[in-house]
A protein has these predicted regions:
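Acidic, polar-rich low-complexity tracts and alpha-helical solenoid repeat scaffolds
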Residues: 2, 6, 17-252
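Repetitive helical segments and hydrophobic/amphipathic motifs
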Residues: 11-12
Length: 252
């Protein structure tokens, strides 16, 4: 009796295992691809990966192999496994360089690094890699509809790097190293034009001039800065410093 029970259990396990396996098997590459895409749309990341991977195993010579490879990258992004996503997208570029998915794959490599980029108080390796990948995308595919998005990402990432330098400039000023603060701030303005950090650096330069008793120069800089599109926090600091400088000038 025990033997029959064990045999029955084994058979049941095999059956359920087979059913689970068959759940992610399809009869054609088209059916695989359609199911994989639906899984992605529904946010079912792991099933999508299984479907695309099984498709590549079952139909390695299919006209949809590059689509499946791209799908693997998307599934990894869906799971927020960005290093895996980078690997899958790079594999597509290496094995299917003329695939219609190649431009988007290159963009998504940059996006995967972007999603890993950390704040200014941590290592910026992923930030630099994301800038490199988005820049390469813009150079390789200048007519892509995603160029605008890539440039926006580049600006945001450069701003992150610059904000770290702004923090250093503020610290130099706080510690009394006026010349170092000025040099840091001027380098930010030159290297990262058009960023929030560049505007913050201009404010640092105005503060340096106040410290150096160049009140009129500071007021001129603050007046120009006030005409820019500033974030509320920076705008408040500019107004407060402007009022202080004006009062100090009136005392002379």
């Amino acid at each position: 009796m025990k033997r029959f029970l064990i045999v029955g259990c084994v058979a049941l396990l095999a059956l359920t295992g087979g059913c689970a396996q068959n759940k992610y098997r399809r009869e054609s590459p088209e059916a695989y691809y359609e199911s994989g895409q639906k899984a992605l749309r529904d946010g079912k990341c792991y099933p999508a990966e299984l479907l695309f991977r099984n498709m590549l195993m079952d139909f390695p010579g299919s006209h949809l192999t590059d689509d499946a490879q791209f799908g693997l990258g998307q599934a990894a992004q869906c799971r927020e496994e960005y290093l895996v996503a980078i690997f899958e997208f790079e594999r597509l570029l290496n094995e299917y360089p003329v695939s219609p998915h190649a431009p988007v794959a290159r963009f998504q490599i940059g996006e995967s690094y972007y999603q890993q980029a950390r704040d200014i108080h941590h290592d910026q390796d992923e930030t630099n890699k994301a800038i490199q990948e988005f820049t390469r995308f813009v150079e390789d595919y200048p007519r892509s509809d995603l160029v605008g998005d890539a440039n926006a990402r580049i600006l945001d990432l450069k701003n992150r790097l610059a904000l770290k330098d702004v923090e250093i400039a503020h610290n130099y000023l706080k510690w009394g190293y006026v010349t170092s603060a000025k040099l840091y701030a001027e380098a930010i303005v030159e290297k990262f034009p058009g960023t929030e950090a560049a505007l913050e650096a201009q404010y640092v330069i105005a503060r340096v001039k106040v410290k150096s008793k160049d009140l009129q120069g500071a007021l001129n800089d603050l007046t120009l800065l006030a005409g820019q599109d500033l974030l509320p926090k920076l705008k408040k600091k500019v107004i407060e410093l402007t009022v202080k400088v004006q009062k100090d000038l009136q005392k002379k």
